[in-house]
């Protein structure tokens, strides 16, 4: 995350204080004052004046901001991002135990693991979880020609997701059956394992090869580009625990409608305008409508799955971060099991 091009480093005492300020604010929803912090006794051994000065420093570097309703301070958007990145505890042992128990000795695919984990976490912790996938990462695994009659044939396509697609192809006068068979054979040789999002480009690149073997190659080429390989990139989202975001008190109803529409149909990862550093893999956005998004991508073979947590600005970020990390851990464990099973089968 790019903290407005600032290198923010807090010493231990200040880190403890700032962490407690944020967590108190998230728990109470109220501005935090120095007197209240002294009364809480976090073992800082500081007077109200000293804590007030430290809070003023936090304000100067943009981590805190003044509240409009009291003399206390509240975390800024920058402060909340800093907390999530560096201070929110992403290790929830209780949640981890519950999930381990749930998945013990269950044979699930990686996709099933992600969906069940997201659903379970939303129920256990009370978070709104969103899982997303798009077909642009799917690849062509098989293409077959089936002749119905002299005027019509069917092209059967199998994608890496297991999805089978049948498309009719009209046998125009300019398209000879033998030429069509040659074209399909070339496509099998050259396009298998190509991403669906790249099929148009890769098919056009075969023009010189088709030209050598097929008389009316342009008609066949256009037929496949326009009618057969016309895959639209689509986003599929599953939302779990939707009621949790609906019941958030600090999000206005008119904003909620827009948020629900967004999380049901859009890539949250792509929605978040955040500069991600190479070593980071969680995006966070604190939005003007008082909602917050945390999103993570997980690579699974030839596709990317996206997992997100959606809540109010005052949601429990530690649990949200923990949820994302736990799902990634479960996926990694599932990968190891699948690899072990494949090796056993080979023996």
UniProtKB/Swiss-Prot annotation:
<keyword id="KW-0804">Transcription</keyword>
<protein>
    <recommendedName>
        <fullName>Heat-inducible transcription repressor HrcA</fullName>
    </recommendedName>
</protein>
<comment type="function">
    <text>Negative regulator of class I heat shock genes (grpE-dnaK-dnaJ and groELS operons). Prevents heat-shock induction of these operons.</text>
</comment>
<dbReference type="GO" id="GO:0045892">
    <property type="term" value="P:negative regulation of DNA-templated transcription"/>
</dbReference>
<keyword id="KW-0678">Repressor</keyword>
<comment type="similarity">
    <text>Belongs to the HrcA family.</text>
</comment>
<dbReference type="InterPro" id="IPR021153">
    <property type="entry name" value="HrcA_C"/>
</dbReference>
<keyword id="KW-0805">Transcription regulation</keyword>
<dbReference type="InterPro" id="IPR036388">
    <property type="entry name" value="WH-like_DNA-bd_sf"/>
</dbReference>
<dbReference type="InterPro" id="IPR002571">
    <property type="entry name" value="HrcA"/>
</dbReference>
<keyword id="KW-0346">Stress response</keyword>
<dbReference type="GO" id="GO:0003677">
    <property type="term" value="F:DNA binding"/>
</dbReference>
<dbReference type="Pfam" id="PF01628">
    <property type="entry name" value="HrcA"/>
</dbReference>
<dbReference type="InterPro" id="IPR036390">
    <property type="entry name" value="WH_DNA-bd_sf"/>
</dbReference>
């Amino acid at each position: 995350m790019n903290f407005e091009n600032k290198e923010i480093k807090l010493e231990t005492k200040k880190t403890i204080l700032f962490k407690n300020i944020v967590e108190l604010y998230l728990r109470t929803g109220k501005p935090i004052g120095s007197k209240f912090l002294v009364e809480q006794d976090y073992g800082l051994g500081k007077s109200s004046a000293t804590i007030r000065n430290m809070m003023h420093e936090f304000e100067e570097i943009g981590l805190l901001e003044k509240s409009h309703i009291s003399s206390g301070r509240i975390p800024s958007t920058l402060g909340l991002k800093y907390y999530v990145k560096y201070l929110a505890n992403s290790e929830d042992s209780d949640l981890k135990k519950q999930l381990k128990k749930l998945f013990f000795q269950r044979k699930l695919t990686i996709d099933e693991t992600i969906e069940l984990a997201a659903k379970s976490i939303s129920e256990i912790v009370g978070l709104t979880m969103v899982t997303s996938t798009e077909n642009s990462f799917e690849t062509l695994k098989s293409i077959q020609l089936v002749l119905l009659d002299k005027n019509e044939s069917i092209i059967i396509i199998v994608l890496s997701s297991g999805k089978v697609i049948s498309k009719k192809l009209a046998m125009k006068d300019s398209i000879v059956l033998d030429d069509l068979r040659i074209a399909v054979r070339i496509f099998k040789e050259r396009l298998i394992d190509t991403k669906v999002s790249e099929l148009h480009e890769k098919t056009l690149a075969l023009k010189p090869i088709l030209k050598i073997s097929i008389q009316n190659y342009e008609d066949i080429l256009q037929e496949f580009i326009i009618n057969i390989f016309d895959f639209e990139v689509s986003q599929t989202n599953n939302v779990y625990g939707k009621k949790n975001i609906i019941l958030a008190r600090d999000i206005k109803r008119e904003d909620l409608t827009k948020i629900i529409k967004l999380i049901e149909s859009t890539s949250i990862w792509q929605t978040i305008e955040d500069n991600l550093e190479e070593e980071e893999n969680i995006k966070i956005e604190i939005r003007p409508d008082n909602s917050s998004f945390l999103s993570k991508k997980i690579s699974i073979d030839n596709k990317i799955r996206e997992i997100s947590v959606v809540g109010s600005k005052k949601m429990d970020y530690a649990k949200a971060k923990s949820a994302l990390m736990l799902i990634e851990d479960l996926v990694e464990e599932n990968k190891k099991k699948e690899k072990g099973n494949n090796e056993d089968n080979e023996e």
